[in-house]
Amino acid sequence: MRVYQFCRPFQLFTCFLCYLLVFVKANKEKISQKNYQVCAGMYSKEDWKGKIDPFISFNLKKISGLSDESDPGLVVAIYDFQDFEHLGVQLPDEEMYYICDDYAIDIGICEEENRDEFIVQDVVYDPYTSTNRSLANPIMTFSQNEVGLHDTRYPIKETGFYCVTAFRSSTSTKFNAVVNFRNAYGQLAGTEINKLPLYGLLAVAYVVAMALYSFAFWKHKHELLPLQKYLLAFFVFLTAETIFVWAYYDLKNEKGDTAGIKVYMVFLSILTAGKVTFSFFLLLIIALGYGIVYPKLNKTLMRRCQMYGALTYAICIGFLIQSYLTDMEAPSPLILITLIPMALALIIFYYMIIRSMTKTVIYLKEQRQIVKLNMYKKLLYIIYASFLSVLAGSIVSSFIYVGMNTIDMIEKNWRSRFFVTDFWPTLVYFIVFVTIAFLWRPTDTSYMLAASQQLPTDPENVADFDLGDLQSFDDQDDASIITGERGIDEDDLNLNFTDDEEGHDNVNNHSQGHGPVSPSPTK
C-alpha cells in the first residue's frame, strides 16, 4: 500500500513550519519514519570560504519492512526550501500527489523515467506573490531501498535554507538515515558559524574589561571592599567562561559532534548554570546593601543567600543534565520535574532582588544619603534597561520580517535568528555586568563612602556631623569596620527578607561627636 501519495496543500508546508523550531544545530541530523523532514541553513563557498565544496549527502543506516524486491523503499528529495511548492502536483479534486508511480504515470502527471521519484514542476503559481515562479535551485530526487551512502551528493551553489524529505513507499517500512549538511568551512551548522568570530570578539572584550578593572583593583588594593573582591572573582569566571564557549565552537567546527564535544557541552552548561546563579546572588547581596550601605551583612542572612544560591545552582544543573538525557525527537513531560523548580527558583530570586533593592532605595531616601541613593538608582535603571534591551531585540527582529512573505522570512531568518535568541542576550549581559562593575569599581573614595556617614542634606542637622569624622579612621579602624571585629552589635546587622529584620531601622541617623564612626550599618 502506497502512503504519503496524497496530501493537502498546506500539510507539507505546516511540517516545515514545525521544523523551524527544531532545525539542525549540527551538521548531521537523523531522520526516520516518524521524523522524515529536516532543514538547515547552508553557505556557498563564495559566501564563506573553506577547504571543500559544500554539499548535502544522504546515508541510509537501517531499513526494514519492504514489501518485495521491487519496493523502492524510500523516495527522497533534496531541495532549496523556497522551491518546496514545486514538489507534487495538484489533482482535479484539489489533493496533492507527490510520488511518480504507476497511477501518476497513467494519468500523465509524470514520465516513466521519473518512476519512484518526487514529482517536480519547473514552474508553479506562487500564492504569496500571485505570480508564476520558477525553480531557484535544482531539486535532487531519488529512491533507495538498500543500506548505505547514496552515491550522489547535492552540491550547494548558492547560500540558502535547504531541506531533505524522505517518504516511505509502504506503511510497514521503517528506516533510519543520517543527512549530512556539510559546509565549506568545517563541521559547524550554518546557524552556528557566526557565533565563532562573535564569541571570540566577546572574549577579547571581557579580557580588556577585566584588565581595566584589575588595574583599579591593584591600584586601590589597600582600600578594597569585599563586594569589589566578589566582582573581580566573577570577572575572572566570566572571562574564562566566554573563552571556553569560543573554544567549544572552534573545536566543534574542527572535530564535529563527537562524544568528547558532547561532554564539553555538558561542562559548558555547568558553567552557564554557575553564571546565571551567581549573577542573581551578586545582585541580591548588592540589593541588600552589601559593601555600600553596610560594611557586611549579618552572618545568618549571608548564609541564607549562599544556601539559596547553591540550591538554585543544583536545580539548574539537574535541569541541564535531564535535558541532555532527554530524546529531543520524543520529548517527555518528565522534563517538567526540573524545569518548573528552576523557573520558580529564578522567579523567587528576581522577586527578592527587586524587593530588597526597593527597600534599600527607600531607606537611603529617608536617610537622605544622596550619593548612595544615586548609585542604587543607577543600578535599578541598569536592570530595567537590560530587560528592555532584550525585549527590544525581539521586537525589532519581528518588525524586520513583517514586510516579508513566509518563504522569504524562513529563507533569511536562519542567518540572524541566533543573534536574537543567543548572542544578543549574552551581549546585553556583558554590557550590564561591565557597567555594574564600573559603578562599584575601587576608587579613592569608594571605601570611605562605604565606611562613613554622609553629610545630611537637612540644614538643621549639618552641625551634627563634621567632615573630620571621615579623616579620623586609622588603618586599624578601617580593618575593624570591614571585618566586623570591633564593636559590632548583632542586632544592628540583623538583616533578613522580612520587614522587621531588614535592618534599616537600626541605623543611627546622626554620628555622635567627632570620633570614629560606629560599625553599625552605614548610610
From Swiss-Prot:
Q: Does the keyword Membrane apply?
A: yes
**Residue ranges annotated as Lumenal topological domain:** 27-197, 252-265, 326-333, 403-417
* UniProt cross-references to InterPro entries, sorted A to Z: GOST_TM (IPR053937), GPR107/GPR108-like (IPR009637), PTM1-like_N (IPR053938)
Query: Where does this protein have compositionally biased stretches of type Acidic residues?
Result: 488-503
Q: Where is this region: Disordered?
A: 483-523
Keywords on this record? Endosome, Glycoprotein, Golgi apparatus, Membrane, Phosphoprotein, Signal, Transmembrane, Transmembrane helix
**What's a GO biological-process term for it?**
retrograde transport, endosome to Golgi
Q: Residue positions of the PTM Phosphothreonine?
A: 483, 498
Glycosylation site list? 132
Q: How does it sit in the membrane?
A: Multi-pass membrane protein
Intracellular or extracellular location(s): Golgi apparatus membrane; Early endosome membrane
Pfam families, per database record: GOST_TM (PF06814), PTM1-like_N (PF21902)
For side Cytoplasmic, which residue ranges?
A: 219-230, 287-304, 355-381, 439-523
According to the record, the segments passing through the membrane are 198-218, 231-251, 266-286, 305-325, 334-354, 382-402, 418-438
Q: Which residues carry this modification: Phosphoserine?
A: 480
Q: What is its main location?
A: Golgi
Q: Name one GO cellular component term.
A: cytosol
What protein family is recorded? Belongs to the LU7TM family.
Name of the molecule in the record: Membrane protein PTM1
Question: What gene name is listed for this protein?
Answer: PTM1
